[in-house]
Design a protein with these regions (language model features):
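N-terminal beta-strand motif that seeds the catalytic metal site of vicinal oxygen chelate
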Residues: 1-20, 26-32, 90-96, 143-146
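Core segments of cupin and vicinal oxygen chelate
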Residues: 12-63, 110, 129
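A generic "binding-loop/recognition-motif" signal
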Residues: 15-16, 73, 101
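Short glycine-rich, polar/acidic loop-and-turn segments at beta strand-coil junctions
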Residues: 61, 70-72
């Protein structure tokens, strides 16, 4: 038996509207949103009385999806440091291929993003950077060079 596909990546955020604006500015489309709760959600999460609002964002090619989750109950648990560096254990980043790193960074900065380091070129293949997005997550951007 083998996996069929990567369905989505989930990011817990504290400001759903800001996260939607950020990923829309990146170029993703809102696929849907809904409140989610019930015994099955409690069992999946291993928590009691879970109430969340979820939003699904889709990449332009339709192959990638990002779930933005805002917990109403139980309260969010903040990790330290909230702006963990790229070498922190756990999920490091989510990377998107973009047409122009510079244009994308400018759009994302207008939505609160900050560069983690700087834009750098890898050989004659890519221009790359990390930006810090909603809830402190690191979003990697890659521009393929011809």
């Amino acid at each position: 038996m083998t996996i069929e596909r990567l369905d989505h990546v989930s990011v817990v955020v504290d400001d759903l509207a800001a996260a939607i604006a950020f990923f829309t500015a990146l170029g993703m489309a809102l696929e849907g949103q809904a409140p989610v709760e019930g015994p099955w959600v409690d069992r999946v999460n291993g928590l009691e009385s879970v109430q969340v609002d979820i939003v699904m964002m889709r990449t332009p090619d339709g192959h990638g999806r990002l779930e933005l989750t805002k917990f109403r109950n139980p309260q969010l648990v903040e990790i330290e440091p909230a702006t963990a560096p790229p070498n922190a254990l756990g999920l490091r980043s989510v990377m998107f291929t973009v047409e122009s790193v510079d244009d994308t960074v400018a759009r994302l900065r207008a939505n609160g993003a900050e560069l983690v380091g700087e834009v750098a070129q890898y050989e004659d293949k890519y221009r790359l950077c990390y930006v810090r997005g909603p809830a402190g997550i690191i979003v990697a951007l890659a521009e393929e060079l011809s």
